[in-house]
From Swiss-Prot:
E.C. designation(s): 5.4.3.8
The protein's name: Glutamate-1-semialdehyde 2,1-aminomutase
Entry keywords, A to Z: Cytoplasm, Isomerase, Porphyrin biosynthesis, Pyridoxal phosphate
One annotated GO biological process: protoporphyrinogen IX biosynthetic process
Modified residues (N6-(pyridoxal phosphate)lysine): K265
GO cellular component terms listed in the entry, alphabetical order: cytoplasm
Cellular compartment(s): Cytoplasm
Lineage: Bacteria, Pseudomonadati, Pseudomonadota, Gammaproteobacteria, Enterobacterales
Enzyme class: isomerase
Length: 426
């Protein structure tokens, strides 16, 4: 047995499923998950000594690559001053100033510890501000594991929510309406059925939890218009896309202004950080200035703030997003060409520094139904064959992949060459 196999066997006796987040267990592709020893730049190194070109990037935060010296040094310096104080620090103010500078739609920001905390808090705030209970989310979009968000669509195109996990009360889930991503008609139907009851729409501007599905040109502006028409707030969940698709996020890339924005992943530079913010009048409803309660023992943790501040300053440097886009575009084009040479039907979606691979005969993938029609079994084989080639992709056909500026063009070309060898055998 490999060292990873031995560790996984031991972990399953102590940790549910052997992992602390389900996708890490390789249930989407089968086999034994890799246990990682270290990471540097664009590479992961497992406990058995094998190196991999990494396109998971800790599920998005590592936009600068692993073990970036500026972030590492910031963490070390902050740790020498203390780990946590439970009181305000100057770094929290500096971090808030930087975030609100980089994302102009955020007049104010509240720091939390995860993307889930950000989305659940933003929804609570939207409900408190509007005095309404219902929310709209989209099939195939993921916004963390808060009860109100673990809801799937029911039997009809428009239906009251049904729980997607045991432990979520149906009476609570009924306030969540699930619409079809990239389908404005389904959203209008929800508003027309409940015109005075919907507090907010929450949406991934690029759906990254059904692989990578960009919005159609009219979708996000259409959501903005519907929210304005019916008096609801628009929450854009930029946990994945923030500072990655563009410096000011996908909202800037696509030209839409939300009322509230949720951030995570890159904002922490690899440390557990989330944030939500937006219009001043909405944020003023948050405790302690307003009645909507939200709190956190470790929110604004000085080490996490130092890591995030260092990361965002690096990400804001000229050329970062141009490099991300150039590398991702080259990889996407190369994968398409290699698949075409082998006669394998493939769609590769990409926006900025994120991309998704779909085995499908369809010309495009634009919604959850398109994703579910793709060949998952072929993806599983592709994943493991690429892993054998030393390329680590997201271990699920329903998760996006991520580029970093630490990847070199040689890494990209080596990945394309590996895919060409795999496609020939697939």
């Amino acid at each position: 047995m490999s060292k990873s196999e031995n560790l996984y066997s031991a972990a399953r006796e102590l940790i549910p499923g052997g992992v602390n987040s389900p996708v890490r267990a390789f249930t989407g592709v089968g086999g034994t998950p890799l246990f990682i020893e270290k990471a540097d730049g664009a590479y992961l190194y497992d406990v058995d000594g094998k190196a991999y070109i990494d396109y998971v990037g800790s599920w998005g935060p590592m936009v600068l690559g692993h073990n970036h010296p500026a972030i590492r040094n910031a963490v070390i310096e902050a740790a020498e001053r203390g780990l946590s104080f439970g009181a305000p620090t100057e770094m929290e103010v500096k971090m808030a100033q930087l975030v609100t500078e980089l994302v102009p739609t955020m007049d104010m920001v509240r720091m939390v510890n995860s993307g889930t905390e950000a989305t659940m808090s933003a929804i609570r705030l939207a409900r408190g501000f509007t005095g309404r209970d219902k929310i709209i989310k989209f099939e195939g979009c993921y916004h963390g594991h808060a009860d109100c968000l673990l809801v799937k669509a029911g039997s009809g195109a428009l239906t009251l929510g049904q729980p997607n996990s045991p432990g979520v009360p149906a009476d609570f889930a009924k306030h969540t309406l699930t619409c079809t991503y990239n389908d404005l008609a389904s959203v209008r139907a929800a508003f027309e059925q409940y015109p005075q009851e919907i507090a907010c729409i929450i949406v991934e501007p690029v759906a990254g939890n059904m692989n990578c599905v960009p919005p159609l040109p009219e979708f996000l502006p259409g959501l903005r218009a519907l929210c304005d028409e019916f008096g609801a707030l628009l929450i854009i969940d930029e946990v994945m896309t923030g500072f990655r698709v563009a410096l000011a996020g996908a909202q800037d890339y696509y030209g839409v202004e939300p009322d509230l924005t949720c951030l995570g992943k890159i904002i922490g530079g690899g440390m557990p950080v989330g944030a939500f913010g937006g219009r001043r009048d909405v944020m003023d409803a948050l405790a302690p200035t307003g009645p909507v309660y939200q709190a956190g023992t470790l929110s604004g943790n000085p080490i996490a703030m130092a890591a995030g501040f260092a990361c965002l300053n690096e990400v804001a440097q000229p050329g970062v997003h141009e490099t991300l886009d150039e590398l991702t575009t080259r990889l996407a084009e190369g994968l398409r060409e290699a698949a075409e040479e082998a006669g394998i039907p493939l769609v590769v979606n990409h926006v900025g520094g994120m991309f998704g691979i779909f085995f499908t005969d369809a010309e495009s993938v634009t919604c959850y139904q398109d994703v579910m029609a793709c060949d998952v079994e072929r993806f599983k084989r592709f994943f493991h064959m690429m892993l054998d080639e030393g390329v680590y992709l997201a271990p699920s056909a329903f998760e996006a992949d991520f580029m970093s500026v630490a990847h070199s063009m040689e890494d990209i070309n080596n990945t394309i060459d590996a895919a060409r060898r795999v496609f020939a055998k697939l």
